[in-house]
């Protein structure tokens, strides 16, 4: 053997080793800095022990080979054995208690069991959202602390049906958390200090023991509470108490149960809260990523409840979380030791008993894998098409192999739900825009001192949010109510055509899939069924009937109940399987790229090699991105059933017959409210996205299909028929003590244009027919004054009448506002309805040229959600909040409204220059102008010069359609001149805050274009119009209405 290289590292001192090379408050950061100096493998001496650190993907790939290395418990983890003893995380390799607990608990963390926990996860996520909403947008939120509360409450509720209610005590953390934080910090410190130093820290040792005992007492109380009051729930706690090891038949001792309860409460929340905290830190540092993530949630979920099915449809959220965990792995290391002396990296010897720490914060930034920008936050590298191409063991934040995190699927589902819920509900901004990331270290890491502010989106109030069911929770698992044909002991059902099902399943998922398939096959004529574990098929595969195998891979190996079967197939002693007809359905998870579908593929190939006949191609289901039951059903319909028909003469009559559509007669008609307005047609939303970053007034883009008969030109308007914001509807219902489904019938509505003699639900009436936000009239004020018995209230209402313009009209105070303020008013609902006008259409400028995308239309709008001028609550724009609530597939009702003739493009765009001036969403009509010019250019026609002056707050804030306009500029369609009110010194703004100022920088160009018969267009506020007109008149003289055309909003 060639000479081995010495493992490099800083020179240790006697007794203290490398203690003085470490910042004890930030030991991890000290070690990370050493990696830059000493390379991919280095060692230091701590507490009298040499500790080796690996920092490259190539080394990690070696160290993750479980045939050569296994987990080592040392350092801070070893110190935690005082707390968690032989629990799943702290047990030594091969420790008997670990094996018993692991085999009992694995099924409790299978994909189906995790899906069933979704409703409880949603419950706690709602509590977080409600807390933030009720605190208001000015509250300073310590995001790491609140996520700690969330994750602790979630693990306790989902696994033990135990409510810690951390959000109901905002001043202090739960005692378990207080003790846990001390123990984690102290364990980390003790692992760093020399043994002699720990011996003299008597008070610290006593305090450590006190906190450990407190945590074990809490776990013991949980056990006692369940035993005193047993609950018939299929949760982790009952599994701990009643489960039996399938190998030894033993249950867990109380001490082992306590150790694992502590393990789950600590490991189940500490790292996940860090993941969430870092994820939102990176999102707020990268507004374009935040926008894309928020848009994905809006497009997939909209404003409705988040369901478990939505999570697999959020690939960008998934990539954001993976990238956050890559840069900041919250459990920053795992440790292995060789089974025998091993050479790693081709030149370093690691002896038995030596431990190697995989230093994840460095390994996961390996430029050899992730490129020169490995230190940058770029979620696209974690999208599936890129993630699947990474070298093996490039992304290991959940540890490795059989000692990897058992609760990974739980943590990931929880984190996906919380990220989606927060993005759906809030706009977040960092409290300190100049915050520099600091790391708080225990045995895990979190951001230190990172605080945010949260503002409810779409104008919701905290009350409305709490009354709105944000999530329907988990739907019943597709397999949860399935009749089980046979059982794990291999019992049969008699009669009909025979079929056998064999499954390999550790967590229960493949078993449930096999049962589901057996149940559906029962309806197709295969009523003589045998269903059992795969190991029972050794020398026992049936012939002359179909055999269906459902299995998966566990850490690259077969499941416990399939090991004998695979060994039999691999032994070479398998008799000919001629006459065996089989099909394999395999499950897997794409994150384990090296072993993805390994066992199903191997079983399929070995059976075929032994002479068995494949009925059909192998089916697969990827638990990371799809619903396993849906994938099984697709495979059954498209592959398995056709093969069974051909091979076993399964006739179509035995197939499952779907409901005959003629048995259910329905008709669909347009809403009655549509008939109250002229010329409304149906549009279907195809896209909606947010155009601005958090912290600035929200602007949105909505695009929808329109029928061919709806004629529009660039510059035209579109009427939309809105509904009132849900929070306004809830306010009205509450004021009149109505349920949303109370029925109201108008026997006579006099002059009101409301449905006659047709029941309307109270919610629909307030939502779709009446203007709830319309300012009260003077007559309304008199009517309300006459309806109150309170002299003081009457006097105040009459004062409002006398000062109507300043106190009511200008502050937009509605009748509903007044009814909520003056609770003494007794007003019949009929009187209230008669006071309100019928809900009217809202008008928006067209922001898409019909020539650019035929039969489509888009609107660009500001979402009006601001403090009410009355000083009470918030004012929500009816039309804009309605549009903001739409999602792709939504139906809305629209009609065209032509602009004035002058506010259209010149007939001859080749010879007539145009100058467009706008700010904010005033860009809308000019976007349609520019797109139409692009279509003109694409027809080979020349274009006269066009200038666009656009004012906004700044780049990456609300610079609407920036990339799109840049493309039009490059094509020669338009030249854009920007003004940024927040950053006027930006190179694009040329020192200008507002569009009128930007005009002055182009005086000569404007004058030249004016001399060549240019037309000037303006779209914006009255203030903008006033400032622009003053500049232009000084520059050009008198402006004629034929060549200076304005739209003021």
UniProtKB/Swiss-Prot annotation:
Catalytic activity as recorded in UniProt: 2 oxidized [cytochrome P450] + NADPH = 2 reduced [cytochrome P450] + NADP(+) + H(+); an organic molecule + reduced [NADPH--hemoprotein reductase] + O2 = an alcohol + oxidized [NADPH--hemoprotein reductase] + H2O + H(+); dodecanoate + reduced [NADPH--hemoprotein reductase] + O2 = 5-hydroxydodecanoate + oxidized [NADPH--hemoprotein reductase] + H2O + H(+); dodecan-1-ol + reduced [NADPH--hemoprotein reductase] + O2 = 1,5-dodecanediol + oxidized [NADPH--hemoprotein reductase] + H2O + H(+)
Residues annotated to bind heme: 405
Biased composition regions of type Low complexity, renumbered to the chain: 471-482
Keyword Transport: yes
GO biological process, alphabetically ordered: mycotoxin biosynthetic process
Domain annotation Flavodoxin-like: ranges: 499-640
Binding of FMN, residues: 505-509, 584-616
Bias-annotated ranges (Polar residues): 461-470
Region (Disordered): 461-491
Entry-linked InterPro entries: Bifunctional_P450_P450_red (IPR023206), CysJ-like_FAD-binding (IPR003097), Cyt_P450 (IPR001128), Cyt_P450_CS (IPR017972), Cyt_P450_E_grp-I (IPR002401), Cyt_P450_sf (IPR036396), FAD-bd_FR_type (IPR017927), Flavodoxin/NO_synth (IPR008254)
MF (Gene Ontology): aromatase activity; flavin adenine dinucleotide binding; FMN binding; heme binding; iron ion binding; NADPH-hemoprotein reductase activity
UniProtKB keywords: Electron transport, FAD, Flavoprotein, FMN, Heme, Iron, Metal-binding, Monooxygenase, NADP, Oxidoreductase, Transport
Record's cofactor remark: Binds 1 FAD. Binds 1 FMN.
Presence of keyword Cytoplasm: no
Family matches, as PROSITE patterns: CYTOCHROME_P450, FAD_FR, FLAVODOXIN_LIKE
Record domain FAD-binding FR-type: where: 678-906
Cofactor(s) of this protein: FAD; FMN; heme
Gene Ontology CC entries for this record: cytosol
Gene3D superfamilies reported for this sequence: 3.40.50.360, Cytochrome P450, NADPH-cytochrome p450 Reductase, Chain A, domain 3, Nucleotide-binding domain of ferredoxin-NADP reductase (FNR) module, Translation factors
Its EC number(s): 1.14.14.1, 1.6.2.4
The family this protein is said to belong to: In the N-terminal section; belongs to the cytochrome P450 family.
Function, as annotated: Self-sufficient cytochrome P450 monooxygenase that catalyzes the regioselective in-chain hydroxylation of alkanes, fatty alcohols, and fatty acids at the omega-7 position. Performs hydroxylation of C10-C16 n-alkanes and C12 and C14 fatty alcohols; and thereby enables the one step biocatalytic synthesis of rare alcohols such as 5-dodecanol and 7-tetradecanol. Converts 1-dodecanol into 1,5-dodecanediol as major product with very little sub-terminally hydroxylated products with the 1,4-dodecanediol and 1,6-dodecanediol more abundant.
Protein name: Self-sufficient cytochrome P450 monooxygenase CYP505E4
Species this chain originates from: Penicillium camemberti (strain FM 013)
């Amino acid at each position: 053997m060639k000479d081995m290289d010495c493992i490099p590292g800083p020179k240790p001192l006697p007794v203290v080793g490398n203690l003085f090379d470490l910042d004890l408050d930030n030991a991890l950061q000290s070690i990370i800095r050493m990696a830059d100096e000493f390379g991919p493998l280095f060692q230091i001496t701590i507490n009298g022990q040499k500790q080796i650190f690996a920092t490259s993907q190539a080394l990690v790939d070696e160290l993750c080979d479980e045939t050569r290395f296994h987990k080592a418990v040392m350092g801070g983890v070893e110190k935690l054995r005082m707390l968690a003893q032989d629990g799943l995380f702290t047990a030594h390799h091969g420790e008997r208690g670990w094996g018993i607990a692991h085999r009992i608990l694995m099924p409790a963390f299978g994909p189906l069991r995790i899906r069933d926990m979704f409703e409880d996860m949603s419950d706690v996520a709602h509590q977080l959202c409600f807390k933030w909403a009720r605190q208001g947008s000015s509250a300073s939120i310590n995001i790491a602390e609140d996520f700690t509360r969330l994750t602790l409450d979630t693990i306790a509720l989902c696994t033990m049906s135990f409510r810690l209610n951390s959000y109901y005590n905002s001043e202090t953390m739960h005692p378990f958390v207080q003790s846990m934080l001390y123990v984690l910090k102290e364990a980390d410190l003790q692992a760093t200090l020399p043994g002699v130093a720990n011996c003299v820290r008597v008070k610290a040792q006593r305090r450590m023991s006190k906190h450990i005992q407190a945590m074990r007492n809490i776990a013991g109380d949980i056990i006692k509470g369940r035993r005193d009051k047993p609950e018939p729930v299929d949760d982790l706690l009952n599994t701990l108490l009643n489960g039996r090891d399938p190998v030894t038949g033993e249950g867990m001792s109380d001490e082992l149960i306590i150790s694992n309860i502590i393990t789950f409460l600590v490991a189940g929340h500490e790292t996940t809260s860090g993941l969430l905290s870092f994820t939102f830190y990176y999102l707020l540092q990268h507004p374009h990523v935040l926008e894309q993530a928020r848009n994905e949630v809006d497009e997939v979920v909209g404003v409705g409840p988040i369901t478990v099915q939505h999570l697999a449809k959020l690939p960008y959220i998934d990539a954001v979380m993976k990238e956050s965990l890559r840069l900041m792995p919250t459990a920053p290391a795992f440790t292995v030791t060789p089974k025998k002396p091993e050479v790693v990296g081709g030149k370093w010897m690691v002896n038995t008993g030596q431990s190697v720490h995989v230093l994840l914060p460095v390994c996961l930034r390996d430029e050899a894998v992730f490129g020169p920008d490995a230190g940058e936050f770029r979620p696209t590298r974690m999208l599936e098409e890129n993630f699947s191409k990474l070298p093996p063991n490039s992304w290991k934040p959940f540890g490795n192999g059989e000692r990897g995190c058992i609760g990974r699927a739980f943590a990931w589902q929880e984190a996906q739900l919380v990220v989606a819920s927060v993005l759906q509900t809030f706009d977040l901004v960092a409290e300190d825009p100049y915050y520099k990331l600091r790391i708080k270290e225990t045995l895990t890491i979190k951001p230190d001192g990172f605080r945010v502010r949260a503002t409810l989106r779409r104008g919701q109030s905290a009350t409305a949010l709490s009354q709105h069911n944000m999530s329907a929770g988990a739907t019943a698992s597709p397999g949860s109510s399935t009749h089980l044909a046979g059982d794990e002991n291999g019992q049969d059902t008699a009669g009909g055509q025979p079929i056998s099902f064999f499954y390999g399943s550790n967590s229960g998922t493949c078993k449930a899939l096999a049962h589901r398939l057996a149940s559906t096959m029962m309806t197709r004529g295969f009523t003589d069924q045998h269903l059992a574990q795969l190991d029972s098929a050794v020398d026992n595969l049936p012939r002359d009937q179909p055999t269906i195998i459902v299995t998966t891979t566990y850490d690259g190996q077969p499941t416990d109940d399939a090991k004998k079967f695979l060994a039999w197939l691999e032994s070479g002693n398998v008799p000919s399987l001629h006459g065996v007809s089989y099909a394999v359905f395999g499950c897997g998870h794409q994150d384990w790229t090296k072993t993805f579908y390994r066992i199903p593929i191997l079983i399929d190939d070995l059976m075929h090699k032994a002479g068995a006949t494949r009925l059909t191609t192998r089916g697969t289901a990827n638990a990371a991105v799809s619903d396993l039951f849906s994938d099984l059903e697709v495979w059954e319909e498209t592959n398995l059933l056709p093969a069974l028909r051909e091979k076993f003469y399964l006739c179509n009559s035995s197939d499952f017959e779907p409901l005959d559509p003629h048995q259910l007669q329905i008709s669909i008609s347009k809403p009655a409210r549509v008939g109250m307005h002229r010329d409304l047609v149906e549009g279907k939303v195809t896209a909606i996205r947010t155009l601005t970053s958090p912290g600035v007034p929200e602007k949105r883009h909505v695009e929808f299909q329109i029928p061919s008969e709806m004629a529009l030109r660039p510059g035209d308007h579109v009427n939309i028929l809105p509904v009132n914001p849900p929070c306004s509807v809830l306010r009205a219902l509450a004021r009149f003590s109505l349920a949303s489904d109370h029925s109201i019938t108008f026997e006579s509505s006099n002059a009101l244009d409301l449905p006659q003699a047709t029941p309307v639900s109270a919610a629909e009436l307030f939502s779709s027919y009446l203007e709830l936000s319309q300012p009260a009239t003077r007559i309304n004020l008199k009517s309300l004054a006459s309806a109150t018995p309170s002299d003081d209230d009457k006097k105040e209402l009459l004062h409002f009448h006398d000062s109507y313009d300043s106190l009511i009209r200008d502050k937009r105070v509605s009748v509903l506002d007044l009814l909520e303020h003056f609770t003494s008013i007794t007003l019949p609902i009929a009187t209230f309805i008669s006071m309100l006008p019928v809900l009217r259409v809202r008008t928006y400028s067209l922001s898409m040229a019909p020539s650019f995308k035929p039969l489509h239309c888009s609107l660009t709008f500001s979402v009006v959600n601001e403090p009410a001028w009355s000083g009470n609550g918030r004012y929500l724009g009816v039309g804009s909040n309605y549009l903001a609530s739409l999602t792709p597939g939504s139906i809305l009702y629209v009609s065209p409204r032509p602009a004035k003739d002058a506010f259209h493009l010149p007939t001859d765009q080749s010879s007539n220059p145009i100058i467009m001036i706008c700010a904010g969403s005033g860009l809308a009509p000019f976007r349609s102008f520019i797109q139409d010019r692009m279509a003109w250019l694409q027809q080979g026609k020349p274009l006269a010069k066009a200038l666009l002056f656009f004012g906004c707050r700044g780049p990456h804030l609300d610079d609407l359609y920036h990339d799109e306009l840049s493309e039009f500029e490059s094509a020669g369609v338009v030249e854009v001149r920007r003004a940024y009110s927040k950053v006027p010194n930006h190179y694009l703004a040329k020192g200008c805050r507002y569009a009128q100022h930007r005009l002055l920088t182009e005086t000569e160009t404007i004058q030249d274009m004016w001399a060549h018969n240019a037309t000037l267009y303006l779209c914006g506020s009255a203030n903008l119009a006033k400032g622009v007109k003053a500049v232009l008149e000084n520059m050009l003289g008198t402006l004629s209405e034929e060549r200076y055309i304005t739209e003021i909003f």
